[in-house]
């Protein structure tokens, strides 16, 4: 399924090949599906890139790694963020609401991940071509 041809089905029941969608995604972030209580996005983090230290007070997050390797950082406070471990394909990262976190691409290929937010975090239809675009947004 080509990224540009995917049509967001909103809150309708949907069947997706998450591995293909994630690996084919070339954008820093793309919203794939948003329901009332849950949202799916895919991300491509460039070599040496990162999500950036962030905190979601209102959202739990489930992040799956489909391609690449990364280091993961967690903390109860911004100043208390520490290295937790490395992840690769088939690992998941679970981030409870209120946890500071960062994911850094440590590999020599783009890091391909998907993220499930509960409740939804990004506006429906969100596409950030680069991290810079994401940083300019208010969400």
Q: Would you name each region that the model predicts?
A:
Residues 1-39, 52, 85, 129-139:
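A short, N-terminal "cap"/entry segment at the start of jelly-roll beta-barrel domains
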Residues 26, 41-58:
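Conserved short histidine dyad/triad with adjacent acidic residue
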Residues 31, 40-44, 62, 84, ...:
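Conserved hydrophobic/aromatic beta-strand scaffold that supports enzyme active sites
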Residues 38, 47, 58, 99-100, ...:
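A generic "binding-loop/recognition-motif" signal
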Residues 51-53, 72-73, 95, 101-108:
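Short beta-strand His + acidic residue motifs that chelate non-heme Fe in jelly-roll/DSBH
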Residues 58-76:
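Glycine- and acidic-residue-biased ligand/ion/polar-headgroup-sensing regions
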Residues 62, 109-125:
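A short hydrophobic beta-strand segment most commonly corresponding to one strand
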Residues 77-97:
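Short acidic-glycine-tyrosine-enriched beta hairpin
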């Amino acid at each position: 399924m080509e990224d540009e041809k995917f049509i967001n089905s909103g809150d309708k029941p949907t069947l997706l090949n998450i591995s293909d969608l994630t690996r084919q995604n070339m954008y820093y972030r793309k919203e794939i599906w948003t329901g009332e209580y849950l949202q799916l996005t895919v991300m491509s983090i460039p070599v040496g890139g990162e999500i950036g230290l962030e905190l979601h007070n209102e959202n739990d997050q489930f992040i799956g790694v489909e391609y690449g390797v990364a280091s993961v950082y967690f903390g109860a406070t911004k100043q208390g963020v520490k290295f937790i471990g490395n992840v690769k394909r088939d690992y998941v990262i679970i981030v409870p609401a209120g946890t500071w976190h960062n994911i850094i691409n440590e590999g020599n290929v783009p890091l391909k991940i998907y993220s499930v937010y509960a409740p939804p975090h990004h506006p429906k239809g969100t596409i950030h071509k680069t991290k810079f675009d994401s940083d300019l947004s208010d969400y």
